Each structure stands twice: as structure tokens, then as C-alpha cells.
């Protein structure tokens, strides 16, 4: 029986991180968590490309464009959408999630979804290094696991 596990990646990889500036109190912490996880996994700084965009609505397009450059192996999209008093929150959440899912499913490389969608700022901060962990860090770890699985799948040929 052949079993494919998310083992540590055995080849050098380059990672792109697309991070939204909006709610930067949260997104800077998500970014720091992702960068720390990548460094701890042995990814050198020069193999990490950070691209900043205005907000969550810009994440899908820039993530897709970055994935098509051929210079990176995977992308982490980071953002934070905090519910306000209008329906804007709902539309931003739906569209950014759908766009990133499309980029992941139809693009040439894996895309990790690291957009927090919370009812309030406390919930967002808790998931950006607080008691809820750091979702940026978790996305980086997940990306490395997916890259490992994809590497193993390509070796089945």
C-alpha cells in the first residue's frame, strides 16, 4: 500500500504571501506568523515574496497573477474582514473567499486561504496570535504540507 503524507518538503521552495493592508493591526500579525513558520521550516528569507494589497477584495486578483508568474511554488493569502453595521461585510467575505477558491482550484500552484472573517476585532486578534493561535502560521504550515503532498503525487508517475 502506498500512503502519501504531508511530510517535510524535500526540495527548495519559494513562497508568495499576499497580505491585505486593511485591518493591518490584524494582518501584520498574520504575516509575522506566516513568515516565522516558513523560516522555522528552513525557507530562507530570499525565498519569501511579500506582496501588499489594499484589502480583501484585491487578494484574489493579485494572488492569481502572482501564481501565474512561475517564480513561486505556492501562495498564502492573508486578510481580515471584521463585521460592521452594513451588508458590505457579507459581500467582501463572499467575493474574496470565492475568488481565492477559484485561484486555488484553477491556478497552477496551491493557494492557502488565510482571510479572517470575524464578528469583531477581538475575535480577529485572538486568531492572529492570541489565544486562538495564529492563522497566518497555520496557513504557512498547511502550504508546506500541500507542497509535500503534491511533490509525492508527481513522483508516482
Curated annotation (Swiss-Prot):
GO terms for cellular component: cytosol; riboflavin synthase complex. Pfam families: DMRL_synthase. It catalyses: (2S)-2-hydroxy-3-oxobutyl phosphate + 5-amino-6-(D-ribitylamino)uracil = 6,7-dimethyl-8-(1-D-ribityl)lumazine + phosphate + 2 H2O + H(+). Keywords: Riboflavin biosynthesis, Transferase. CDD domains: Lumazine_synthase-I. (2S)-2-hydroxy-3-oxobutyl phosphate binds at residues 85-86, 127. 5-amino-6-(D-ribitylamino)uracil binds at residues 22, 56-58, 80-82, 113. Its EC number is 2.5.1.78. GO terms for biological process: riboflavin biosynthetic process. One of its GO terms (molecular function) is 6,7-dimethyl-8-ribityllumazine synthase activity. It comes from the Bacteria. Pathway: Cofactor biosynthesis; riboflavin biosynthesis; riboflavin from 2-hydroxy-3-oxobutyl phosphate and 5-amino-6-(D-ribitylamino)uracil: step 1/2. Signal peptide: none annotated. The active site is at residue 88. Catalyzes the formation of 6,7-dimethyl-8-ribityllumazine by condensation of 5-amino-6-(D-ribitylamino)uracil with 3,4-dihydroxy-2-butanone 4-phosphate. This is the penultimate step in the biosynthesis of riboflavin. Belongs to the DMRL synthase family. This is 6,7-dimethyl-8-ribityllumazine synthase. The gene is ribH.
Amino acid at each position: 500500500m502506498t500512503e502519501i503524507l504531508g511530510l517535510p518538503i524535500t526540495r527548495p521552495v519559494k513562497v508568495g504571501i499576499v497580505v491585505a493592508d486593511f485591518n493591518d493591526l490584524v494582518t501584520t500579525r498574520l504575516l509575522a506568523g506566516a513568515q516565522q513558520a516558513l523560516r522555522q521550516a528552513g525557507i530562507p528569507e530570499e525565498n519569501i515574496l511579500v506582496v501588499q494589497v489594499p484589502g480583501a477584495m484585491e487578494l484574489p486578483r493579485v494572488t492569481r497573477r502572482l501564481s501565474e508568474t512561475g517564480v513561486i511554488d505556492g501562495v498564502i493569502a492573508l486578510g481580515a474582514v471584521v463585521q460592521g453595521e452594513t451588508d458590505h461585510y457579507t459581500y467582501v467575505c463572499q467575493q474574496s473567499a470565492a475568488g481565492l477558491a477559484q485561484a486555488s482550484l484553477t491556478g497552477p500552484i496551491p493557494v492557502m486561504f488565510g482571510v479572517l472573517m470575524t464578528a469583531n476585532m477581538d475575535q480577529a486578534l485572538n486568531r492572529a496570535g492570541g489565544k486562538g493561535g495564529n492563522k497566518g502560521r497555520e496557513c504557512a504550515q498547511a502550504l508546506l504540507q500541500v507542497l509535500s503532498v503534491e511533490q509525492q503525487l508527481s513522483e508516482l508517475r
